[in-house]
Amino acid sequence: MSKRFLPITLVSALAIGSLTWSTTNEDALAKEKSQKSPEIRNVIFLIGDGMGVSYTSAYRYLKDNPATSVAERTEFDKYLVGQQMTYPEDSAQNITDSASAATAMSAGVKTYNAAIAVDNDKSEVKTVLEAAKERGKATGLVATSEITHATPASFGAHDESRKNMNAIADDYYKELINGKHKIDVLLGGGKSNFVRPDIDLTKAFKKDGYSYVTDKNQMLKDKNKQVLGLFAPEGLPKMIDRPNETPSLKDMTNSAIQRLNKDKDGFFLMVEGSQVDWAGHDNDIVGAMSEMEDFEKAYKAAIEFAKKDKHTLVVATADHSTGGFSIGAKGIYNWFGEPIKAAKRTPDFMADAIVKGADVEKTLKQYIDQNKVKLTNDEIKTVSDAAKTKNVTNIDNAIEAIFDNRTNTAWTTGGHTGEDVPVYAYGPYKERFAGQVDNTDQAKIIFDLLKKR
């Protein structure tokens, strides 16, 4: 359904949302004029890819202390200021993908799905990262996906299609601002997009003064202001599956902040918790909650820096939600988080081991704590039957079903969903992000704030 043919009820809702945004942000601007805000030097913008309200709610319930009468707040809850609309400007689809949503948040422009910082005419649009670099600030991108994936790419590159990740890596190196590389810190996965038969971009970056690091220890030891860190051929392993040598999102965020903060003019940093979305596409509640924890720790690290610095704005949001994740299913008014805590690895990890020949029962009992979830013979048999197909997806789905049934979780899709997503903010001018906003407002506000410094 094309956006221009939206039902009357939805159009009315959008109109009311616009009115709410207008009132809220007019109030914020009035407050800004009457109260002197601290000088803003730095902006840290965090995106939980696919992190709709079902994910933030379920994560709260998962962390809840059952001994208390109320649900404890997460780090996100403390700084909730509003929510944002996510629709694209696409003639064929009115639910966004990550590229269109990230372009809206990076450049303030609605565009078609798959667009990387280009508009509907496929013309390049300036991003907030580029505007920050034009003003002499240090800049960085951090992600648990390939660093060339849709979200980070839409802040630091320009392309007609998110699929062109080699070309996006080329953009990171070749696109200059004031004669300098426009991204000082690049940390994430995607080594295969940089080290290719036609070119080795890691050598090119090193020749220009960047450090190149490939594991956690190298990253922590290196103090260079400019760094390229590629920790996996593609995306990083999920937090629950991650080996010790792979940095967490918090590790990468802290490393980026420490480097960028050396710039006297301040910095802009975009951090993406990429794989809440990937788990949602896979309908994997274990992976989703693992990645929520990884993202929360990175978010907390950014907030802690901002509290000490006092001149840093931290904004966190999502680009869309994924999977149609339902907290509760089958008409049963309960959701149980405890079975998730029994998992020591994701279903993906277990399925991969089984398809390579590992014993089904031993693998399940090795990676699912039997003191927390005692597997039934029927559950083991279902996975064993799936293993006979020698299809990793069938095995993965069978293991995921154990956790869905135990937690009473349901899913409606393997794709994205179109609901509004939460917005969190802390620091100078946080009130500008309050209320009902559009995803393009994120960039518009940041562009305006960059002019203040």
What are these regions (language model features)?
Residues 1-9:
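Bacterial N-terminal signal peptides that target proteins for export
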Residues 2-3, 36, 40:
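Structural motif marking the loop-to-transmembrane transition
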Residues 10, 14-19:
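Hydrophobic core
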Residues 18-35:
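Sec-dependent signal peptide cleavage junction
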Residues 40-42, 51-57, 61-95, 99-103, ...:
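A post-motif C-terminal structural segment
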Residues 40-59, 105-106, 110-121, 125-156:
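Mobile, glycine-rich extracellular loop/lid and propeptide segments
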